[in-house]
């Protein structure tokens, strides 16, 4: 409810959050707005970096790809060395724009796993990756998905195990829930 209140400028909620949590949600709002403004364009490095910069505003000084080695908590995978990040991101963007996939959910799972494995920024890679999920769905004329709090453990398990098929099925199930929810509000598909 608090995230909703901040994103939609709803002042009817009393917010009990730390300054960092507030910045995270406010920054997410601006990053999503930027992604929506660019929905008609193919994904570029500049867009991805701009999203990461926006997500980290007032939290961490991010101006581009990371310059140090990072490790992902709970994962066995070690992201590439900093000097390899740009090349990996070029490959990632090529996958997003040119690779043929079985369906949108397979594409989302594959590219999301690629992005999270690259871990291109010092901080907020998860939030940036989820903004990119929303961008990719909307860019391909699909409803966006939301990963509910009670489903986060499943989401992180798919990431940690690099389970592309499971993650694709997870995204598809979330999408189907969003469609059902939208239909309750009168949207027709």
Where are these regions (language model features)?
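FIC/Doc superfamily catalytic core
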Residues: 1-123, 127-189
């Amino acid at each position: 409810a608090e995230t909703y209140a901040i994103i939609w400028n709803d002042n009817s909620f009393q917010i009990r959050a730390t300054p960092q949590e507030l910045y995270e949600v406010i920054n997410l709002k601006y990053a999503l707005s930027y992604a929506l403004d660019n929905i008609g364009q193919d994904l570029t490095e500049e867009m991805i970096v701009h999203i990461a910069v926006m997500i980290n505003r007032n939290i961490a000084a991010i101006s581009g790809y990371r310059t140090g080695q990072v490790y992902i908590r709970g994962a066995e995978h070690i992201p590439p060395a900093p000097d390899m990040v740009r090349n990996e991101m070029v490959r990632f963007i090529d996958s997003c724009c040119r690779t043929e996939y079985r369906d949108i959910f397979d594409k989302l799972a594959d590219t999301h796993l690629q992005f999270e494995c690259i871990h291109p920024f010092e901080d907020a890679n998860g939030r940036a990756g989820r903004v990119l999920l929303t961008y990719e769905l909307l860019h391909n004329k699909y409803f966006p998905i939301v990963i509910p709090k009670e489903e986060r453990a499943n989401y992180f398990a798919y990431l940690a195990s690099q389970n592309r098929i499971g993650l694709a099925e997870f995204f598809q199930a979330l999408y189907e829930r969003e469609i059902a929810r939208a239909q309750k509000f009168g949207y027709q598909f």
